Regions:
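Cell wall/extracellular polymer interaction/catalysis modules
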Residues: 2-155, 162-175
Length: 175
């Protein structure tokens, strides 16, 4: 099963790293007036065949859901080594903090996506680049390690499983 119901299914070292990122994220959200119920964390240092998209529950101080997550295929990215860029047309993923925007129709996955607004110099072109959070039906629900996710699933968007996207959509609609 792809979705983690608790932090038990996340390796301890990964959870510690996520907790540190989540604490910094919560401080940023508090300071800037953003929602402090949940945050989404993507750790592209994790092998693409393992879960690397996480929904962090601030109240429970733990991972609520986890999914595989595709990275962009542009600028000579490989299945094992993503290349990051904020340039329009690069088809690369971008690092940094994002604000989740409006829910919209998507032709991929469960047919919805959320607009992403980059909040840092490394991703401030995200909205112009049409970077959105969406799912893709062929993306596996379970880890495929030691295999990698194939390139071509993402043109820079964080792409997650349909199952976790349904759960993320439920959380966001409830906010």
């Amino acid at each position: 099963k792809c979705a983690a119901s608790s932090s038990d299914s996340v390796p301890v070292k990964v959870e510690q790293r996520l907790r540190e990122k989540a604490q910094a994220g919560k401080a940023y959200c508090d300071k800037n007036g953003y929602n402090t119920n949940y945050c989404f964390l993507v750790d592209f240092s994790i092998h693409s065949g393992k879960r690397r998209f996480f929904v962090w529950d601030f109240k429970g101080d733990s991972v609520k859901y986890a999914s595989l997550c595709a990275h962009g295929y542009g600028k000579n990215s490989t299945v094992s080594k993503p290349v990051f860029s904020n340039v329009e047309g690069s088809y690369c993923s971008s690092l940094g903090k994002y604000k989740v925007g409006i829910r919209s129709y998507s032709k991929w996955g469960i047919n919805i996506h959320y607009k992403l607004h980059g909040l840092e110099a490394t991703n401030d072109n995200a909205f112009k680049r049409y970077i959105v959070l969406h799912s893709y039906t062929p993306l596996p629900e379970t880890e495929v390690y030691p295999l990698h996710l194939p390139l071509g699933i993402s043109q820079g968007c964080p792409v997650i499983s349909d199952e976790v996207m349904r759960k993320v959509d439920g959380l966001l609609k409830a906010e």
